[in-house]
Swiss-Prot record:
CDD domains hit by this protein: CYP4
Keywords for the protein's UniProt record, in alphabetical order: Endoplasmic reticulum, Heme, Iron, Membrane, Metal-binding, Microsome, Monooxygenase, Oxidoreductase
EC number: 1.14.-.-
Species per Swiss-Prot/TrEMBL record: Drosophila melanogaster (Fruit fly)
Role, per record: May be involved in the metabolism of insect hormones and in the breakdown of synthetic insecticides.
Needed cofactors: heme
Protein name as it appears in the record: Probable cytochrome P450 4e1
One Gene Ontology CC term in the entry: endoplasmic reticulum membrane
Gene Ontology MF: a single term: oxidoreductase activity, acting on paired donors, with incorporation or reduction of molecular oxygen
Binding site for heme: E307, C444
Protein family: Belongs to the cytochrome P450 family.
Transmembrane segments: none
Lineage: Eukaryota, Metazoa, Ecdysozoa, Arthropoda, Hexapoda
Length: 531
């Protein structure tokens, strides 16, 4: 009995000793990096906070503490380096071998499988090469038609929710718009999310992204085996099956339509251009001389929908929120719409060419992405030792690239908390000092798609509405944003004490969101001020 009891009591000590000895080399190397002191077993997890917002604030606090440079931290026995140094960014993003994603992306595997976002090695290289033509200029023009159609429906929806000066959560509304756009462009089907919000498929998209975000910040729910015992697991399984069945059914129908068409002599390029979707491109593609399998089709379509939905919700949401707080910039954008489209042409859709000539709109979106990048962090995992800028980064380390921090670095951007779209005319940040869509061989393949959608939606909103803050008092009187991330700790604490309930509370997991929504008002425009 005593032997069993002693063994039971000694087990924790044995496990701690076992893990500590196994990490001696990695710890020794990483201790050369600045960072907070860690505890056995938990690392720095006890300092991180309990919510995505608290964790984000902790990261920025450490960033200030360690001179706005790289720092290391531990979550249990998982070693991490937060990368904010542009030299490190350049090495990592330019590397042809450092392309393995961090383990947080494993949370998407049950839904996305091993598509372009999560695959690595030869599969990633082959599929990247295969998918690149799907974002060719001509296909983007086709996608733009779909974006315009859904944006028109979105304007009608906004007229209803904004009626009578109503304060509403624009982030919530944008979620349904971008879901409609991505389903139309990815699979050539409309799920009418804006009108049918309670459908099982629409709700499933919302639920699964929330679950992934929740698991990312829960050590035990992050484990795929332990998550089976979580109270959320049964509902998650149901949600996952709903999405898998929906996507696979559409793929099967699309394959059948193509077979029927080809059997009677219809060529693939004779399908209506308007109906050509990302899925059609995949069905016409080959890898190693063969068509894609059903599983590969599922993985790439699901990945495209995931990456093209949540990120554009964030991009559109924060851009329109900034319109509400900065009326002077909104006026410049409205006048540009009049100049480009003509005083009598504001009611029609902007063409692909017109969108591309809206220079101030481009500057506005760049500045919005500097402050609120849709993807705040990118994770890479070192499968071998790397020497970066003279430092040895050991095998088994997660490199978290802090894209969000880059935008608030006053060494790169003067007066970073001031919203100044024209800064991108005056200041030319280095190629790895401003990377809202990543860079290098694993950059965002859908960057042009995302920017086109954001610009199309913002352009249409500006022409139809004057965007107002939730309350008049929330208009920025000096050009500064309400977000306090990146400020010196003392100034941040002082400013946070005066924050309004309608000021965004940022949270970051795989995409940037506002935990309390993006509340604003809209007033319909009647005429074009052609001055």
């Amino acid at each position: 009995m005593w032997i069993v009891l002693c063994a039971f009591l000694a087990l924790p000590l044995f496990l701690v000793t076992y893990f500590e000895l196994g990490l001696l080399r990695r710890k020794r190397m990483l201790n050369k990096f600045q960072g907070p002191s860690m505890l056995p077993l938990v690392g720095n997890a006890h300092q991180m906070g309990n919510t995505p917002t608290e964790i984000l604030n902790r990261f920025f606090g450490w960033w200030h503490e360690y001179g706005k440079d790289n720092f290391r931290y531990w979550i249990g026995y998982y070693s991490n380096i937060m990368v904010t140094n542009p030299k490190y960014m350049e090495f990592i993003l330019s590397s042809q071998t450092l392309i393995s994603k961090s383990d947080v992306y494993d949370l998407t595997h049950p839904w996305l499988g091993l598509g372009l976002l999560t695959s690595t090695g030869s599969k990633w290289h082959k599929h990247r090469k295969m998918i690149t033509p799907a974002f060719h200029f001509n296909i983007l023009q086709d996608f733009h038609e779909v974006m315009n159609e859904n944006s028109t429906k979105f304007i009608d929806q906004l007229k209803k929710v904004a009626d009578g000066g109503n304060i509403f959560d624009f982030q919530e509304e944008a979620h349904y718009l971008t879901l409609d756009v991505i389903c139309d462009t990815a699979m050539g089907v409309s799920i009418n999310a804006m009108e049918n919000r309670s459908s099982s498929v629409v709700q499933a998209f919302k639920d699964i992204t929330y679950t992934i975000k929740m698991r990312a910040f829960s050590p035990w729910k992050r484990n795929k085996y332990l998550f089976h015992f979580a109270p959320e697991y049964p509902e998650y399984s149901k949600t996952l099956k709903t999405l898998q069945d929906f996507t696979n059914e559409i793929i099967a129908k699309r394959i059948e339509v193509r077979k029927s068409g080809l059997e009677v002599g219809i060529k693939a390029d004779e399908f209506s251009r308007k109906k050509m979707a990302f899925l059609d491109t995949l069905l016409s593609s080959k890898v190693d001389g063969r068509p894609l399998t059903s599983q590969e089709l599922y993985e790439e379509v699901s990945t495209f929908m995931f990456e093209g939905h949540d990120t554009t919700t964030s991009g559109v949401g924060f851009a329109v929120y900034l319109l509400s707080r900065h009326p002077d910039e909104q006026e410049k954008l409205f006048n540009e719409q009049c100049d480009v489209m003509g005083a009598s042409g504001l009611g029609r859709d902007a063409t692909f060419q017109e969108i591309s000539t809206m220079k101030h709109l481009d500057l506005f979106i760049k500045e919005a992405q500097r402050l609120y990048p849709s993807v705040p962090f990118i994770g890479r995992f070192t499968e071998k030792d790397y020497v970066i800028d003279g430092d040895i980064v050991p095998k088994g380390t997660t490199l978290n690239l802090g894209l969000l921090m880059l935008g608030y670095n006053d060494r790169v951007f003067k007066d970073p908390h001031k919203f100044q779209p024209e800064r991108f005319d005056r200041e030319k940040p280095g190629p790895f000092e401003y990377v809202p869509f990543s860079a290098g061989p694993r950059n965002c393949i859908g960057q042009k798609f995302a920017l086109l959608e954001i610009k199309t939606v913002v352009s249409k909103i500006i022409r139809n509405f004057e965007v107002l803050p939730a309350l008049d008092e929330l208009v920025s009187k000096d050009g500064y944003i309400s977000t306090t991330l990146g400020l010196q700790p003392a100034e941040k604490k002082s400013r946070d004490a005066h924050n309004h309930k309608y000021d965004p509370i940022l949270s970051a997991s795989m995409t940037l969101k506002s935990e309390n929504g993006l509340h604003l008002r809209m007033k319909q425009r009647l005429v074009c001020d052609s001055t």
